[in-house]
Amino acid sequence: MSEKIIRGVKFGVLSPNEIRQMSVTAIITSEVYDEDGTPIEGGVMDPKLGVIEPGQKCPVCGNTLAGCPGHFGHIELIKPVIHIGYVKHIYDFLRSTCWRCGRIKIKEQDLERYKRIYNAIKLRWPSAARRLVEYIKKISIKNLECPHCGEKQFKIKLEKPYNFNEERNGSIVKLSPSEIRDRLERIPDSDVELLGYDPKSSRPEWMILTVLPVPPITIRPSITIESGIRAEDDLTHKLVDIIRLNERLKESIEAGAPQLIIEDLWDLLQYHVATYFDNEIPGLPPAKHRSGRPLRTLAQRLKGKEGRFRGNLSGKRVDFSARTVISPDPNLSIDEVGIPYTIARMLTVPERVTNINIERIRQYIINGPDKWPGANYVIKPDGRRIDLRYVKDRKELASSITAGYVVERHLVDGDVVLFNRQPSLHRISMMAHKVRVLPGRTFRLNLLDCPPYNADFDGDEMNLHVPQSEEAIAEARELMLVHKNIITPRYGGPIIGGGQDYISGAYLLSVKTTLLTVEEVATILGVTDFVGELGEPAILAPKPYYTGKQVISLFLPKDFNFHGPANISKGPRACKDEICPHDSFIVIKNGLLLEGVFDKKAIGNQQPESMLHWSIREYGTEYGKWLMDNVFKMFIRFLEMRGFTMTLEDITIPDEAQNEITTKIKEGYSQVDEYIRKFNEGQLEPIPGRTIEESLESYILDTLDKLRKVAGEIATKYLDPFNNVYIMAITGARGSELNITQMTALLGQQSVRGERIRRGYRERTLSLFKYGDIAPEARGFVKNSFMRGLSPYEMFFHAAGGREGLVDTAVKTSQSGYMQRRLINALSDLRIEYDGTVRSLYGDIVQVVYGDDAVHPMYSAHSKSVNVNRVIERVIGWKR
């Protein structure tokens, strides 16, 4: 068979003759099976249409199930019907051409000129040719008299979905499909071309169906239900309805039935043919099963997420994959994933037998499919597969294998697999991990790996895929391993890093009050692979003590320099340089942590230009992996030793603090009352550009916002600096000072759409308030804290504010998902060429220099090509 190169794909409309030629049989009866359950010849399951049962031979091509592609049949329609997919095209043809002579309603000399222009531009500038066609249609539709035959033209209206009405001498006449077909037949080929169609492959009258193609059985196979009853495909049901109606229409015409009955049956045939193509036509009731379920017809098989394109071509279900719940395991390396034994025994990797690995593989074969590490299949050099479940003497088989065999063995420690969590919103939602087979029934994941996957452990499930070829495994190992993706391609900062307990532990270990004995240091270092001298303790007498900073310094490169504020550098503890009494400015000189604490700004995930970021960027991702596998584990160990809990005592403030807050609330309420009094007396000064009512709302909101801030400051002033809740908030481990304010002092103003709550009953939010009351409490201000508890109406307002967040989340998720899909489809053919330009599939330049600087964000210094300050700091240990 000679090879051919595909130059292009051309779409057209099937002519009635083409439908008959590609058909192997006419479908003439609505009966499907006879009494024995054998398909009837001339029915919709005629054996000539293809084979769906194994062992049968196709009477047309002689092939079995594996080789028979299926064959088309056809139904000769008694009356023509409109193809629902071409209604708009038919409408354009009818309005642009004369009903009598079929010519475009434009003068002959103008038509000749348009033809010359169209022929000159149609190949070189197809978009310009399309605009010319639209222009021809536009001016032709406007003409009320045919310039060729002089006939008066009537206005045609489309009554959706497929009825065409014509206004003739004041009355409205419905055009039948036969009449429409006659008109379309009269349009000459030259005019069809000027209206944008190729008359060789798309004559307009072919859009009115006289012959309906019947698809092969292979695309609409029947299934046998457990009870032994055959269930037919939705398309088969629809085709039976069409044939049944076609027969009734034929009988009615032959019996000389009244025109009204014939037209009703014709309309019904039109409905069935339309819903056969698309069962979701606006304005048309969908065809349904007896159960009430709408039929899934041709368009539904192609459209949407579950359709043929997105469901079976762009995305497929795959083998060698697993899915289960994820659990945290801080003892795994960031590059590893814990896999249950059950899954490790089911998923296999093909390993080729060589003289080096033959003994190990023989042991896998002896272990078999049920004992880990074993094997499930042996593939001989001739391609035959041996299933080890059915081999009685596995030892004999193991001894017979030689180099060249392939064994599908179980997953073992160190195998490379792909790990993914949906929704996969960016590239690093799928990364490669190394297998660690563990007991249990869940996947185990290091907590540091959560941010790129956006994973947590409240029931999330993740997918695992096992690459099968050496090339795929090599690509995954070189490009996709977790430590090679610590720096995100989004902005060039570390997406993997500390969070929650890691940050609390790092802060408590690095804070200047932390002193450790040699034994405690040894306990902490026991979870790391540190080997080396501890150095001299910071305190020698009365007892040797190391500081937490000394322990952390053991893991920093000896030439590493860094300066920068910590997360706790806020308010009264803020520091701008190294002269800092609050320990809130980090100074690392020649690998020694001299000052400052490690918190979110130093080691947190998604923190660009942090200590973690520069150390990974300058010493490589292997160092970053080592740091996370050791130092971060050490932070957790220290937290375990010290203990870290949260109790009600942590959010209880003394009475004097509560009295201060109550006084401030009263002052705030008085201020609001004063604004309301001024408003009622007409003395309130409006804010420029706002109405007096808007100004009042703005003044009240500002006052209540200040009140919440003051209450929060009072509450935190009375909290112990080593209060665990306070530590979590100031270090950036979890929560914020606002959360502390809400737990200890007051919740503050609840808002809906950025305003105070105003909807409810007429002129008041709830029935317990007076009409027209706009005081803080009547409009959603909550003066209680979570600790003290909310009153019933405060609880109601709080729920109203919370609901807005839930609705927002649901709406934005679907909107952003759809926007991303459109963006991906629009940008999918862009790529960076070797000359640095960004080009489309056709070579069009979209960007002369990628990103205007030709720098990959992943390898940039936080989106800059070079950070000069950092270069100076790195070399001389000081910033400019």
UniProtKB/Swiss-Prot annotation:
Range of residues in the leader sequence: none
Activity regulation (UniProt): (Microbial infection) Binds to viral protein RIP (AC Q3V4R7), which inhibits global transcription.
Residues at which Mg(2+) binds: D456, D458, D460
EC id: 2.7.7.6
Positions of Zn(2+) 3 binding: R573, C575, C580, H582, S584
Miscellaneous comment as given in the Swiss-Prot or TrEMBL entry: Corresponds to about the first two-thirds of the bacterial beta' subunit.
Gene Ontology BP term (one): DNA-templated transcription
Cofactor(s) this protein requires: Mg(2+); Zn(2+)
Location in the cell: Cytoplasm
Major localisation: cytoplasm
CDD domains per the UniProt record, alphabetical: RNAP_archeal_A
Cross-referenced Gene3D superfamilies: 1.10.10.1950, 1.10.132.30, 2.40.40.20, 2.60.40.2940, 4.10.320.40, 6.10.250.2940, 6.20.50.80, RNA polymerase ii
Assembly behavior: Part of the 13-subunit RNA polymerase complex. Interacts with TFS4.
Group of enzyme by EC: transferase
Residues that, per the record, bind Zn(2+) 1: C58, C61, C68, H71
Protein name: DNA-directed RNA polymerase subunit Rpo1N
Source species, domain of life: Archaea
Binding positions for Zn(2+) 2 per the UniProt entry: C98, C101, C146, C149
Pfam hit, one: RNA_pol_Rpb1_4
GO MF, one example: zinc ion binding
One GO CC annotation: DNA-directed RNA polymerase complex
Summary of the function given for this chain in its UniProt record: DNA-dependent RNA polymerase (RNAP) catalyzes the transcription of DNA into RNA using the four ribonucleoside triphosphates as substrates. Forms the clamp head domain.
Cofactor info, note text: Binds 3 Zn(2+) per subunit.
Keywords assigned: Cytoplasm, DNA-binding, DNA-directed RNA polymerase, Magnesium, Metal-binding, Nucleotidyltransferase, Transcription, Transferase, Zinc
Swiss-Prot/TrEMBL catalytic activity: RNA(n) + a ribonucleoside 5'-triphosphate = RNA(n+1) + diphosphate
